[in-house]
Regions:
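Surface-exposed amphipathic alpha-helical tracts and adjacent flexible/coil segments at the periphery
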Residues: 4-22, 26-40, 49, 53, ...
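Beta/alpha (TIM)-barrel catalytic core signal, keyed to glycine-rich beta->alpha loops juxtaposed to Asp/Glu
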Residues: 74
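Conserved nucleotide-cofactor-binding alpha/beta core module
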Residues: 78-79
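Short, small-residue-biased leader/transition segments that mark boundaries at the very start
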Residues: 1-3, 232, 236-245
Length: 245
């Protein structure tokens, strides 16, 4: 049961955000209230959602519970953010393809907390829109079961075992000042299905440079970038590329 984990985290002064960021079927969404109620009563800090029906249900039944909208919603613009805000969205995790300039404009015109991906895998498709894993092996990314077939080698022409679909990992630790200037409220670091040592190590590096806002040393950058599948800056990959959308 996850409830003791919630209590322990709060004892240590750590907030807990519960992920419900998949598309829900009819029978599942009918059970959502009963599923969330024990967490809500224990002081859950926020819930992360993808399904619009779940968003409305949570807003109606738990009006004082903070709702964060997942990158699986593929939120890319001002009107989407304004719509989500009407249904209780407090924070929006922007699609990884959104530029820093676009995030800044959204923040200034919508007044909603912006969360941005800064470290981890980049999707070959678009956030929340990829059906590759679902079509290839029946494991849908929109159900939290992506098998990451894009990481596998494929044949391209006369070339065998080429990783043509496997993107470099994002590493945005050198772009913290730009993210701050864009109005980004929170940073998202990939941790799901990762070992605890990886997650704690990456978070520790980001925490250090967020607190100091000093220029990242070459040694630290090499260390943190080496934890993933090579690297790209946020400014060189998703957050500044006009062709990603």
């Amino acid at each position: 049961c996850a409830l003791p984990i919630l209590d322990y985290a709060h004892l240590k002064g750590v907030k807990v955000y519960l992920t419900v960021n998949t598309l829900l079927k009819n029978d599942e969404i009918e059970k959502l209230y009963d599923y969330l109620l024990p967490f809500y009563e224990r002081g859950l800090d926020a819930v992360l959602v993808q399904d619009l029906g779940a968003l409305k249900l949570i807003h109606d039944r738990f009006p004082d519970l903070s709702i964060h909208t997942s990158k699986q919603m593929t939120v890319t613009g001002i009107y989407s953010v304004r719509f989500l805000k009407q249904f209780g969205g407090q924070r929006v995790v922007m699609a990884r393809e959104v530029s820093l300039a676009e995030m800044k404009e959204i923040h200034e015109k919508c007044g909603m907390e912006i969360e941005a991906f800064v470290h981890g895998a980049l999707c070959y498709s678009y956030s929340g829109q990829c059906l590759f894993s679902s079509m290839l092996g029946g494991r849908s990314g929109n159900r939290g079961r992506c098998a990451q077939p894009c990481r596998l080698p494929y044949c391209a022409g006369n070339k065998k075992d080429t990783y043509i679909l496997s993107l470099k990992d994002m590493c945005g630790i050198k772009d913290l000042q730009k993210l701050k200037e864009s109005g980004v409220y929170s940073l998202k670091i990939e941790g799901r299905m990762k070992q605890a040592g990886y997650a704690s190590g990456v978070v520790a590096y980001y925490r250090r440079y967020i607190d100091s806002m000093k220029e990242v040393s070459d040694k630290d950058y090499k260390n943190i970038a080496g934890l993933g599948r090579s690297e790209e800056h946020t400014s060189d990959s998703s957050h500044e590329s006009p062709s990603r959308m």
